[in-house]
Amino acid sequence: RGVLVEELFSEEGVGTMVHTDSYREIRPLKEEDIPELLSMIARSVVDSKLVDRNYEDIAAKIDDYYVLTLDDSIVGCVAVYPYPEHRSAELGCLYIKHRHEGRGYGRTLCEFARKKAEEMGVDFIFALSQSAVHYFRDRMHYAEFSRDSLPPERLRALELSGRKSGVFGLRLKDNN
């Protein structure tokens, strides 16, 4: 594609931009964002890369969801589900729109989730995946853990789902 087309018709463009507003930010999900989030992740749900969620599921846990925006357009999402009684948190619903992949936004959201988990005071953050094994292990340096390391209620839900997800996690040393 030409530079002018890229500049005019993408959120990122190719030139220098000066403005007073935050161009790229991670913010809490708003209720009015839920339909867009569901539409955005739909293909990955069909491909079994993400767990199926509906409006009510997300609305019930809306405080756990965050979106990455570029110029006020949602380009990615992540959820941080706390399990305080197990001193752990789950990184879930990690997704970047296809045209924004390869720009480090997945890493940005994973690091954001880790910081949120640290703020919660938990000792362990984990992600469940059957398709992003190499991403979590090789790029994010998450170690592989047994399913026994999961909070009991999360383990039950995983077993009931029938998904063959691996468990990848990080011990958060600063909270010990």
What are these regions (language model features)?
Residues K116-Q130:
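Conserved GNAT acetyl-CoA-binding A-motif
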Residues T69-D71, L170-K173:
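Active-site beta-strand termini and strand-to-loop segments that position acidic
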Residues L50-S88, G92-I96:
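A conserved beta-strand-loop-helix scaffold within acyl/acetyltransferase catalytic domains
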Residues C110, S131, Y135, S149-L155:
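Short glycine/proline-centered loop/turn elements that form peptide/ligand docking sites
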Residues F126, H141-G166:
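Conserved catalytic-core motifs of GNAT/GCN5-like acyltransferases
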Residues G102-K115, A127:
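Conserved acetyl-CoA-binding loop-helix of GNAT-fold acetyltransferases
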Residues R1-D57, G102:
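C-terminal catalytic "cap/lid" subdomain
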Residues L94-E101, S131:
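A short, internal acetyl-CoA/4′-phosphopantetheine-binding micro-motif in the GNAT/acyltransferase core
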